[in-house]
Regions:
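Active-site microenvironment for binding and transforming phosphate-containing groups
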Residues: 1-333
Length: 333
């Protein structure tokens, strides 16, 4: 038997193989097999999705993106997600841990900038629904108070946080300046975007004809109900205010399914609740950009409603305040 085993290259107690070597009684492979076993346990990093402006994407000197809620490590808002998934909460909310937000911001920077991330600084705002526009001149500043920020410094990623409000990004192609705006209804009423363009003229000599603008996802006119007092405020400021508002009747599922049951009680089509007043913040900010002198062809609108799409976006209104924050960012290389 020994001669037979020897003739095929084996002896008692051993077995040879081109892919590795095992000794009798050993249960763990060595060499390449050990490496393969380790690779099978690696968990892939969740994908981080962004919305992008087709216009800004054509400018190689600019980095920009509108974050969504996917690809982070936050689990407090959706604990039912698979263990390998989490929300990309980028705001320091009272619900989330600071370490999670910092990890999410690092992931966002790496996903957007790749190897360049180490050379960039993220600059954010302490937002308060004001018309305050800040100019970043200090290369060391990373946190400012206001609701808009602009700079012509390279490698500064300007960020505004939203969870229904409207983010607006601007790029002056001639002077290499960028700006980011947080525009809720109060900021929009105060013309924060229009003010910002005026500040760019003063600071950088910007000609509005050289500006490319992008309006990101936010609560749409389909979902943004407001009170009559908001309509009165807008009518006092904008001649086109009537075009920004619409009356929306709430649907009644039972009435819609069985209309004959209600015909004797109430005329068809008449809602007992009455219409809700809805505001179009996308259009309100687009009109301000036009009034500031920016060409309609140089304004892009993502046009996605955050309140309708909570699987992709955070929505303060739909999720009743218990939600995270997206970040819209822009910078020049």
């Amino acid at each position: 038997m020994d001669d037979l085993l020897a003739s095929i290259g084996l002896t008692h107690g051993t077995r040879s193989s081109r892919k590795g070597t095992w000794t009798e009684g050993a249960r763990k492979p060595v060499g390449k097999k050990k490496k393969l076993a380790a690779e099978t346990t690696k968990v892939p990093t969740p994908k981080i999705d962004f919305d992008f402006s087709s216009l800004l994407a054509k400018a190689p000197a600019v980095v920009h993106g509108f974050s969504t809620r996917s690809g982070g490590v936050t689990r407090v808002y959706r604990p039912g997600l698979p263990k390998s998934q989490g929300d990309l909460n980028l705001g320091f909310t009272s619900h989330d841990e600071r370490k999670n937000v910092e990890a999410n911001r690092t992931r966002m920077m790496q996903a957007l900038l790749g190897k360049e991330a180490k050379d960039w600084k993220l600059v954010t705002l302490q937002q308060r629904h004001t018309p305050v526009v800040r100019v970043l001149r200090d290369t060391e500043a990373t946190h400012l108070r206001g609701d808009a920020v602009m700079t012509d410094l390279p490698h500064r990623l300007l960020g505004v946080m939203t969870a229904d409000c409207i983010p607006v990004l601007l790029y002056d192609r001639k002077n290499g300046a960028v700006a980011a705006f947080h525009a809720g209804w109060r900021g929009t009423l105060a013309r924060i975007v229009e003010r910002g363009v005026g500040t760019m003229k003063i600071e950088y000599g910007t000609d509005p004809k050289d500006i490319v603008a992008a309006i990101g996802a936010g609560i749409g006119p389909c979902c943004y109900s407001v009170g009559e007092e908001v309509r009165h405020e807008f009518e006092s400021q904008f001649a086109y205010a009537p075009e920004l508002f619409s009356d929306v009747y709430e649907s009644e599922p039972i009435r819609d399914k069985y209309p004959l049951l209600f015909m004797t009680a109430r005329a068809p089509g008449h809602s007992p609740i009455g219409p809700q007043l809805h505001l179009d913040l996308w259009e309100a900010n687009r009109r301000q950009l036009l009034d500031a002198g920016i060409s309609a062809k140089k304004i892009s609108v993502v046009g996605t409603c955050t309140a309708c799409g909570t699987s992709r976006y955070f929505s303060h209104r739909t999720e009743e305040g218990f939600t995270g924050r997206m970040m819209s960012v822009i910078g020049v290389r």
